[in-house]
Amino acid sequence: MSIHLKGLKPGDLGEVTLIVGDPGRVELISSLFTNVESVVDTSREFVLYVGEYQGRRVSVCSTGIGVGSTEIAITELLENDAQMIIRCGGCGAWREGINPGDIILNSGMARSEGLLSAYVPAVYPAVPNPLLLSQIHNELTSNHKTVHVGIGLTSETYYFGQGRTPALNTRIETPNLIEYWEPRGIINCEMETAVLYLLGSLYNIPVANCLVVHVSRTNEKWTNDEDYRRLHRESAELVLNAALKFVNTNTQ
């Protein structure tokens, strides 16, 4: 089934699929591959390349921003026999001491009650494969990356749902979500991971994330664009290394 990932068919994806929000990042990450092929080329926000990494078939696909388009992309990847999916993206840090350029691995995701309620009730946990997450953590720390592990929040909106104040209506009070969630153990916020974790559990495949911190919401310091691009490529390479080690360990 490939209604939106036009041209994708079973057998295309290989052993590991990375997903990113930005279609432009597909080209960046696929620069790590050899024998690169374009399977989906700018179908809405979806771009999908496949290639080889260390002699193994891998792929990278963009999902666009947010829950709706991400659910479409992940579902169609899963329906076309994705064996492992890892989100390589960005996030905002909500805890002091987590700095722009650091990396966050989420061991679970809080979410709004409406998020994917068509699939599961709100009490159903959104969690990664713990062994895959641990493998990624080991690879990152072995390569001297600053890594934080903890529970994140997947928001359905960028502005109100993350405590930002658009000039919508001054009579609408903007909730201070960081003040609410940070004492409850939430270390970061983004817009896609819970979808991946829920669908990974339902389809019974290993999933995880690896998020570059692009902004600290405690002091509004940002990673500059050049460093952000470099960090995404570096972290994606380490994620691929970890993913293939995970495959080797868990298929013997």
Question: Where do the language-model regions lie?
Answer:
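His/Asp/Glu-rich mid-to-C-terminal helical/loop segments that flank catalytic regions of hydrolases
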Residues: 217-252
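Generic structural signal for well-ordered, non-membrane alpha-helical segments
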Residues: 18-19, 26, 66-70, 125, ...
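Active-site rim beta-loop-alpha module in soluble metabolic enzymes
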Residues: 126-185
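Metabolite-binding pocket within alpha/beta catalytic cores that recognizes anionic/polar moieties
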Residues: 1-135, 139
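Short acidic/polar active-site loop segments enriched in Thr and Asp
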Residues: 83-84, 187, 206
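Flexible, glycine/charged-enriched surface loops at secondary-structure junctions
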Residues: 35-42, 144-151, 247-252
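Non-catalytic positions within long, well-ordered alpha-helices that form the structural scaffold/packing
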Residues: 78-79, 182, 201
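Zn-dependent metallopeptidase/amidohydrolase metal-coordination segment
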Residues: 194-227
